[in-house]
Amino acid sequence: LTIKVVTDSTADLPPDLIQKLDITVVPACVIFGNKTYRDGIDISQDEVYHKMITENIPASTSQPPPADFADAYQKLLKDADEIVSIQATSKLSGLCNSALQGKNMVDGSNRIAVVDSLSVSMGLGLLTLMAARLAKAGESLPTIIEQLKESIPRTRLWGFFDTLKYVLQGGRLGKAKALLGSVLPIKAILTMRDGELHPTGAVRTRTKGIERLIDNFKKAVNVQDAAVVYSTTPDDAQTLKERINAISDKIPVYISRLGPALGVHGGPGTLVLALREKVANLNQEIKDGEKLKKRISLPSLHRPKLNSFCL
């Protein structure tokens, strides 16, 4: 069976990995004034941050229409047997709901599983990479979904924000907004927990912010892989990657750039650290579709329940 993997542009995946692992990315929408752009297609990261810094144009985002997901699914099902579509947290975005609606517009919708990652940026990205490697290795849809279910609660994400201005304007803070409504010149650290953003600290300098991200990495257990995401400061991202490699040099650490859809909420200077902890008792590792010798059989799942799967 051939399984294709779909995600949305808020995953912030590096382009080379998208191509290498044959991942389909449905773009979210970025809105500046009265103009709507497709994330990464009609507008680039540089253009977004230029508008934010120099033009001071109010920005917002929206999920793609269900038809965009339906079109992607229909094209893939011409050659694929099944699809797993992994989306940004449903608690902060309508992307998962849009994907579910798009699925229901497609003939053969029972061959599509939609999964709520309960994360964003490379938290979603790391889960998507895992699913794509499993699919490339020939794993079944139930196995991929089972491993996603195991990995989602073990995927961690922290964001360092140079300013709270864009975070507060974006309206995605939920419970964190009341705690971050201060006008003090602080730089906030937020974490993703149960699909929502929560404040976890504040610092007054970028250096201290990077140290906080490093401290969070040190507290993680059995890290499988990690990612550093930046908006406008690639040197800081490289420094953070090198610091992580110095602590744990055996895990892959990806660097990517915060895409337009999340960039308008994070703003210039944002740094994100995402990591995925190993699943307990899982004696298996997949690398770019090559199966290693040590394997375990995962419990089978009742297939009909997977067809509308959304965590």
Segments (PLM) and residue ranges:
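Short, flexible active-site-proximal loops enriched in glycine and acidic residues
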Residues: 80-83, 111-115
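Glycine-rich phosphate/diphosphate-binding loops that line cofactor/substrate pockets in enzymes
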Residues: 71-81, 216-222
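Positively charged N-terminal leader segments that act as targeting/secretion signals
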Residues: 288-306
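Glycine-rich, highly charged phosphate/nucleotide-binding loops
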Residues: 62-72
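Ordered, amphipathic secondary-structure segments that act as subunit-interaction surfaces
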Residues: 75-88, 94-97
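N-terminal glycine-rich anion-binding loop in soluble enzyme alpha/beta folds
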Residues: 4-63
